[in-house]
């Protein structure tokens, strides 16, 4: 019988604390940020480093569920009187134009487990407690079972102000804090989590808005692709005082943590899959600290195991996966991005590989490192790429990715470091 790769590996966001691996220092930072009386929590980093997975763990801790903290051996970091919250979780998208648009989305979000609207008091609404974790002692959140006869109409508890989404939002939040957070659940506050915050088109004024709405009873957490807070919030000066204890910069994992993903997967497979000595380290080395890529490679190893039979992932199976990767057959999403970027041009493919393989120095603000075109130009020309300046533009055009972001004259950065590592491993063409 075929083994389900999803039992041990997943490319999806990790919600279950039992599947979460490593990130000890970040877990400590989450505890500190949640237990600060006021303050904004900011989570940022490159693609593929596990931002959304950490954010879901932050949500669990906010509810009072500290199983992850205890399993990480950090029980002594849990305060005697830990602050607890009800939570709202919203994933932004590129169609959100600005702050007003975002608030409009929030006050109309009907998600039964994560939406703001589910918590607005309403006489006809059937709300029950539920756990986001498998743990028996998990802190409860609230979800809607039935919206009732009134549907999602506002109630006497929270007034909708026509043509004023900001004041309507304030009214909703005030009603939630009074009736659900304090009276019903006896919690300390409401935590509003905004994932993929970076895709909002115009973020000007959002810092000021968040500052005006933040109180000891209302806390915000924003998460997105970025190097620092400035990449997430345009008017970041507005919230600098709020964020002293809430900056969570996510870097690539250590090799030991990446190996931990494989060891945890082996536990989850409960004996149906074994990993030969050295295999976990080899997969971790291929993943280069990006948990998303480690998970993808792990899943593909299980698929290869299923095609051959047996119960052991060894070097032979891993090399078969690597061969498929080199040929562009293993990971269709990454391969599609690669082919879109090179556009059938051998010269562009050569240049892209040279840039991906270019040695870069990590720094405290940019763990990926930047690439310099002139450092690869000579080698590219020696390999037959005659018109470097003609093949380069497609790599920075949005409609083809973009694969690269222009930082300065002749200086670029890979938008997706997982794709960069994929290109390093793939054969040219």
Question: Can you say where each PLM-predicted feature lies in the sequence?
Answer:
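P-loop NTPase nucleotide-binding core
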Residues: 39-192, 199-201, 218, 376-378, ...
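The catalytic "switch" region of P-loop NTPases
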Residues: 6-10, 182-191, 197, 201-288, ...
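C-terminal leucine-rich, beta-strand-based interaction scaffolds used for sensing/assembly
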Residues: 2-7, 319, 323-429
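An amphipathic alpha-helix signature
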Residues: 99-107, 255-263, 280, 365-373
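A short, basic N-terminal segment
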Residues: 1-44, 61-73, 78-80, 429
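Active-site catalytic microenvironments for nucleophilic, acid-base chemistry
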Residues: 57, 61, 65, 109, ...
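Glycine/serine-rich loop-strand microenvironments at binding/catalytic pocket rims
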Residues: 20-49, 144, 210-211, 216, ...
């Amino acid at each position: 019988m075929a083994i389900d790769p999803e039992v041990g590996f997943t490319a999806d966001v990790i919600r279950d604390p039992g599947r979460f691996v490593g990130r000890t220092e970040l877990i400590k930072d989450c505890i500190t940020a949640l237990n600060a009386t006021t303050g904004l929590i900011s989570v940022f980093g490159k693609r593929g480093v596990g931002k959304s997975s950490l954010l879901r763990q932050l949500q669990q801790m906010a509810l009072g569920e500290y199983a992850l903290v205890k399993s990480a051996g950090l029980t002594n970091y849990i305060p005697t009187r830990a602050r607890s919250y009800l939570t709202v979780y919203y994933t932004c998208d590129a169609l959100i134009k600005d702050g007003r648009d975002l608030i409009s989305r929030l006050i109309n979000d009907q998600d039964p487990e994560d939406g703001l609207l589910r918590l607005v008091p309403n006489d006809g609404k059937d709300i029950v407690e539920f756990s986001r974790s498998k743990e028996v002692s998990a802190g409860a959140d609230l979800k809607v079972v039935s919206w009732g006869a009134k549907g999602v109409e506002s109630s006497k508890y929270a007034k909708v102000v026509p043509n004023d989404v900001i004041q309507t939002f304030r009214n909703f939040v005030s009603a939630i804090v009074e009736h659900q957070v304090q009276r019903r659940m006896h919690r300390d506050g409401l935590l509003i989590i905004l994932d993929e915050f970076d895709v909002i088109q115009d973020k000007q004024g959002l810092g000021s808005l968040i500052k005006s709405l933040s109180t000891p009873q209302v806390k915000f957490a924003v998460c997105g692709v970025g190097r620092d807070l400035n990449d997430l919030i345009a008017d970041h000066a507005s919230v600098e005082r709020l964020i002293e204890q809430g900056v969570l910069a996510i870097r690539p994992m250590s090799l030991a943590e990446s190996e931990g993903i494989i060891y945890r997967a082996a536990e989850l497979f409960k004996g149906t899959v074994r990993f030969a000595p050295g295999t976990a380290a080899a997969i971790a080395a291929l993943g280069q600290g990006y948990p998303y890529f480690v998970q993808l490679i792990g899943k593909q190893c299980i698929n290869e195991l299923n095609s051959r039979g047996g119960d052991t992932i060894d070097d032979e199976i891993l090399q078969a996966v690597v061969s498929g990767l080199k040929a562009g057959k293993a990971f269709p999403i990454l391969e599609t991005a690669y082919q879109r970027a090179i556009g059938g041009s051998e010269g562009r493919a050569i240049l892209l590989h040279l840039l991906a393989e270019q040695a870069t120095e990590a720094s405290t603000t940019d763990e990926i490192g930047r690439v310099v075109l002139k450092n690869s130009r000579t080698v590219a020309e020696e390999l037959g790429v005659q018109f470097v300046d003609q093949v380069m533009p497609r790599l920075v055009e949005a409609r083809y990715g973009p694969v690269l972001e222009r930082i300065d004259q002749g200086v670029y950065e890979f938008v997706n470091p997982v794709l960069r590592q994929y290109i390093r491993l793939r054969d040219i063409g």
